[in-house]
UniProtKB/Swiss-Prot annotation:
Localization: Cell inner membrane
Gene Ontology terms: cellular component: plasma membrane
Membrane topology: Peripheral membrane protein
DNA-binding region in chain numbering: 246-265
Pfam entry (one): TrfA
Protein's UniProt name: Plasmid replication initiator protein TrfA
Length: 382
């Protein structure tokens, strides 16, 4: 149900939530501009309305009711049942049994198709609404400038690995990426991404893009990027930053989950290029993939203090990715964590020691109260 939008009250709620007065004023003002004059409709309510509409439309996808069977059909079915009963007593398989199974399978397939159609329509409708209202990532998943954010579904996956720097990156073709949650399936095509650099660059680019309407490009310099990452300001790190941006652009990720449905081909960066290369006015231009934003929707993302997070080692950072994506962190098996890190470590004792060191590092960073290994489980207290 629509309600009158109180800008001052909304601004105060944002300030109470930890945003600066300036950011709160910006969000509240933009919300007033994008909402109708007398009412405000949230993204969540749009999705609910879209779902209701699709529920109504999906009725048309259901098969029409079958007419009542004729006397001839009834007689045929009765004979089939009698034959099936006789065959059962003689331990003989029947076509009738197979036909029943086929009917059941066909019904399940149809239900699956209807469900997929509803999810696809909902996704399309939601993306259209976001574009029409010129919403930004910040409108959907706000976080303070001192923090960074990432979707929970990427935080719990092996999309960014902790493999040794000396080992060349793999070129992957439609590879299934390990995910802690069984209902989530990710396939990836592109050069292997590492937590050491690619993960940090992607998170910083999302920070640059968060206040720009989705679908519009953003620009920044290599100097700004390296400075915000805490990297040295020189040609070597400028080259490293450009290589990361190129890898993030040359990706195709298929994503399927019960919550989101199916995303066919998502790139972590939709487009990247260098403007005025070689000149003092040179800048990077990046466009964020619109479908990435869907992974943030519904408060399914985690945010963290950037100054502490970016200084963690890759293993400690991946550990924090997992634990921070849960309100109440569940213990994680050592082997599950190894798979989530994409680690090549084959010696259990060595991996246990490495994880123990990461726990100490994470505890020392102040991002968590306590982290430790007990038996074959990694524990965390936020």
């Amino acid at each position: 149900m629509n309600r009158t939008f109180d800008r001052k009250a909304y601004r105060q709620e944002l300030i109470d939530a930890g945003f600066s007065a300036e950011d709160a004023e910006t969000i509240a003002s933009r919300t007033v501009m994008r909402a109708p004059r007398e009412t405000f409709q949230s993204v969540g309510s749009m999705v609910q309305q879209a779902t209701a509409k699709i529920e109504r439309d999906s009725v048309q996808l259901a098969p029409p009711a079958l007419p009542a069977p004729s006397a001839a059909v009834e007689r045929s079915r009765r004979l089939e049942q009698e034959a099936a009963g006789l065959a059962k007593s003689m331990t003989i398989d029947t076509r009738g049994t197979m036909t029943t199974k086929k009917r059941k399978t066909a019904g399940e397939d149809l239900a699956k198709q209807v469900s997929e159609a509803k999810q696809a329509a909902l996704l399309k409708h939601t993306k259209q609404q976001i574009k029409e209202m010129q919403l930004s990532l910040f409108d959907i998943a706000p976080w303070p400038d001192t923090m960074r954010a990432m979707p929970n579904d990427t935080a719990r996956s092996a999309l960014f690995t902790t493999r040794n720097k000396k080992i060349p990156r793999e070129a992957l073709q439609n590879k299934v990426i390990f995910h802690v949650n069984k209902d989530v399936k990710i396939t990836y095509t592109g050069v292997e991404l590492r937590a050491d650099d690619d993960e940090l660059v992607w998170q910083q680019v999302l920070e640059y893009a968060k206040r720009t309407p989705i679908g519009e490009p953003i620009t920044f310099t290599f100097y700004e990027l390296c400075q915000d990452l805490g990297w040295s300001i020189n040609g070597r790190y400028y080259t490293k930053a450009e290589e990361c941006l190129s890898r993030l652009q040359a990706t195709a990720m298929g994503f399927t989950s019960d919550r989101v449905g199916h995303l066919e081909s998502v790139s972590l960066l939709h487009r990247f290029r260098v403007l005025d290369r070689g000149k003092k006015t040179s800048r990077c231009q990046v466009l964020i993939d619109e479908e990435i934003v869907v992974l943030f929707a519904g408060d399914h993302y985690t945010k963290f203090i950037w100054e502490k997070y970016r200084k963690l080692s890759p293993t400690a950072r991946r550990m924090f990715d997992y634990f921070s994506s849960h309100r109440e962190p569940y213990p994680l098996k050592l082997e599950t964590f190894r798979l989530m890190c994409g680690s090549d470590s084959t010696r259990v004792k060595k991996w246990r020691e490495q994880v123990g060191e990461a726990c100490e590092e994470l505890r020392g960073s102040g991002l968590v109260e306590h982290a430790w290994v007990n038996d074959d489980l990694v524990h965390c207290k936020r």
